[in-house]
Design a protein with these regions (language model features):
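Positively charged, phosphate-engaging catalytic surfaces used for nucleic-acid and nucleotide handling
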Residues: 1-146
Length: 146
């Protein structure tokens, strides 16, 4: 069983590495969309009512204080154009990591208020940002794949 699963993973990694940047971006965007849906469910269970505030808390952590609107302006996007649709695969992967880790923390810590959920999302965003910086990636607000 494990040998088969390992082989499937090797094939998946090989296939992923052969994708173009646009294909990787599309793949990561779909994962991010599913992750956000799941995160929203966990946030709702934690008492979140203002989802814009909740999502901005995560963006502020990851993007050094920037809200979704700030990111959109920096990227030169039109009103209501989705910032996630205008990210490269690496930036989407960073956001997916923020999303999955926040969902996990909300559930594990049994977060039960909107304030705690927003604080948790912001903290996870900062942790992801710090990890990227420590890995040697110059992420400081310049990761703009438009």
């Amino acid at each position: 069983y494990f040998a088969i699963q390992t082989r499937k993973q090797e094939i998946s990694e090989k296939e992923y590495s052969s994708l173009t940047e646009d294909e990787k971006r599309f793949y990561q965007r779909n994962l991010t969309k599913k992750g956000n849906y799941s995160l929203n469910q966990a946030a709702k269970n934690a008492g979140v009512k203002n989802f814009d505030k909740f999502h901005n808390a995560g963006y502020k952590g990851l993007y050094n204080g920037e809200t979704a609107d700030d990111i959109a302006k920096r990227k030169g996007l039109r009103y209501r154009e989705d910032i996630l649709d205008n990210m490269g695969s690496e930036e989407l992967a960073a956001n997916l990591f923020r999303i999955t880790q926040t969902e996990s923390r909300l559930k594990r810590d049994k977060v039960d208020t909107e304030k705690k959920a927003c604080d948790t999302h912001n903290k996870i965003g900062k942790i992801v940002r710090k990890a990227i910086r420590q890995a040697g990636r110059n992420y400081a607000r310049r990761i703009a794949y438009t």
